[in-house]
């Protein structure tokens, strides 16, 4: 039952045409990778659940109950597969439409990010260069102290610590200075990127084409369609579960009745 619940929880994210993600020859979109991962997980849960059912039926309690769960499990698996096939095209259409309708915005934001990246890259390179120089300078100052320690006695450890502490503090202070300088240099570009994003979203709201409100309306429409498409398939799944639950109930009641009779006879 746990496997069934897990399967239902994720089958809405996957389509019927998904393939294993490690078998792809062509580059995949993010949606395809997510769907393939979910499909692999669902298959693993389904196979693992069938193994547990088989082990239970082989046990003494399973033989006594005689629920024939394995037959019902295979039937249930077919029902779940059918459900995925029915809902798969609807979810695929939803993701395709969402990706298509936000393509322009994503392209514009990628362009903005690339422009800002090119502007700040010199500052990042300069920061990295200065940091490497500071580390090298620190290493040069510390190296003689290490030699002194190897050549000296144990009592010089305290002296070494006293000499290293100022050097460590100096490195920390110089690094903090460089970080503060970098932060000040990048601040205008961070503000610029934030303003660009705000402008893109504002233009999207005011445009005569696809707006954020339209995205929300279309998403709601697709989700409503998905819900309507899923109702018959979910009802089929519920009907497939009924024999399993009824068989379990009958078998359990038989065991309870038998145990009650034995207790009364004693």
Swiss-Prot record:
Its main location: secreted. It comes from the Eukaryota. The modification Methionine sulfoxide is found at residue 109. It is found in: Secreted. SUPFAM superfamilies: Apolipoprotein A-I (SSF58113). Homodimer. Interacts with APOA1BP and CLU. Component of a sperm activating protein complex (SPAP), consisting of APOA1, an immunoglobulin heavy chain, an immunoglobulin light chain and albumin. Interacts with NDRG1. Interacts with SCGB3A2. Interacts with NAXE and YJEFN3. This is Apolipoprotein A-I. It comes from Acinonyx jubatus (Cheetah). The lineage of its organism: Eukaryota, Metazoa, Chordata, Craniata, Vertebrata.
């Amino acid at each position: 039952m746990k496997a069934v619940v897990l399967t239902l929880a994720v089958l809405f994210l996957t389509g019927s045409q998904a393939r294993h993600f490690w078998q792809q020859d062509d580059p995949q979109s993010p949606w395809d990778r997510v769907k393939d991962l979910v499909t692999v997980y669902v298959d693993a849960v389904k196979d693992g659940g069938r193994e547990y059912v088989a082990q239970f039926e082989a046990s003494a309690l399973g033989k006594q109950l005689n629920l024939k769960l394995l037959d019902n499990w295979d039937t249930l698996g077919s029902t779940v597969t059918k459900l995925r096939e029915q809902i798969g095209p609807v979810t695929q259409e939803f993701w395709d439409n969402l990706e298509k309708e936000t393509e322009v915005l994503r392209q514009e934001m990628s362009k903005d990010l690339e422009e800002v990246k090119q502007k700040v890259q010199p500052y990042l390179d300069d920061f990295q260069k200065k940091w490497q120089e500071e580390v090298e300078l620190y290493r040069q100052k510390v190296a003689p102290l290490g030699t002194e320690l190897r050549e000296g006695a144990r009592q010089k450890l305290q002296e070494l610590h006293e000499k290293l502490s100022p050097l460590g503090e100096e490195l920390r202070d110089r690094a903090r200075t460089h970080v503060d300088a970098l932060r000040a240099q990048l601040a205008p570009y961070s503000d610029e990127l934030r303003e660009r994003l705000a402008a893109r979203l504002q233009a999207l709201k005011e445009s005569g084409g696809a707006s954020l409100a339209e995205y929300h309306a279309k998403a709601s429409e697709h989700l409503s369609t998905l819900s309507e498409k899923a109702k018959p398939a979910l009802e089929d799944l519920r009907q497939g579960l009924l024999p399993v639950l009824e068989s379990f109930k009958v078998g359990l009641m038989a065991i309870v009745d038998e145990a009650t009779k034995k207790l009364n006879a004693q």
